[in-house]
């Protein structure tokens, strides 16, 4: 006979660790803005995006949605004791500057701002021009 399975386990919660210094990774695309706040080793402490804070469709790509997402991610990270972040910005989207300003206004001290947008060395063909 097969071994009997145990009763349903409780989901294991990770204990909250104190992270005073971290990194904020802002990925701003044409359709959305995603903010991930990590500890110095790269483990995600908190995250938020335009869709996560309640925006749908084309409203996710607005600077206002990026600001709200950054504020939400900062509040969650500050519950872990985060005080200072180094910001890494990636992508061409409209929410880049607004997200950085929202991190500052939420109470996080911004140490440095680095643009890590990847540059293609003549890689894939770009999308065709829009005709409106």
Swiss-Prot record:
GO cellular component: ribonucleoprotein complex; ribosome
Compositionally biased spans, kind Basic residues: 7-16
Pfam families in the cross-refs: Ribosomal_S11 (PF00411)
Ranges that cross the membrane: none
Annotated segments matching region Disordered: 1-24
SUPFAM superfamilies for this protein: Translational machinery components (SSF53137)
GO biological process: translation
Lineage: superkingdom: Bacteria
A single GO molecular function term of this UniProt record: rRNA binding
Keyword Transport on entry: no
InterPro entries: Ribosomal_uS11, Ribosomal_uS11_bac-type, Ribosomal_uS11_CS, Ribosomal_uS11_sf
UniProt keyword terms in alphabetical order: Ribonucleoprotein, Ribosomal protein, RNA-binding, rRNA-binding
Family, per entry: Belongs to the universal ribosomal protein uS11 family.
Function as written in the Swiss-Prot or TrEMBL entry: Located on the platform of the 30S subunit, it bridges several disparate RNA helices of the 16S rRNA. Forms part of the Shine-Dalgarno cleft in the 70S ribosome.
Assembly information from the UniProt record: Part of the 30S ribosomal subunit. Interacts with proteins S7 and S18. Binds to IF-3.
Name of the protein in question: Small ribosomal subunit protein uS11
Species name: Bifidobacterium adolescentis (strain ATCC 15703 / DSM 20083 / NCTC 11814 / E194a)
């Amino acid at each position: 006979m097969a071994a009997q399975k145990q009763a349903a386990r409780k989901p294991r919660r990770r204990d909250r660790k104190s992270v005073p210094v971290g990194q904020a990774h802002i990925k701003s695309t044409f359709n959305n803005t995603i903010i991930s706040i990590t500890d110095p080793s790269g483990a995600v402490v908190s995250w938020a995006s335009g869709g996560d804070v309640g925006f749908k469709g084309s409203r996710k790509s607005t600077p206002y949605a990026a600001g709200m997402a950054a504020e939400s991610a900062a509040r969650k990270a500050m519950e872990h004791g985060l005080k200072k972040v180094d910001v890494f910005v990636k992508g061409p989207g409209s929410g880049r500057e607004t997200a950085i300003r929202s991190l500052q206004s939420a109470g996080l001290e911004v140490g440095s701002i680095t643009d890590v947008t990847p540059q293609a060395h003549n890689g894939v063909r770009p999308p065709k021009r829009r005709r409106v």
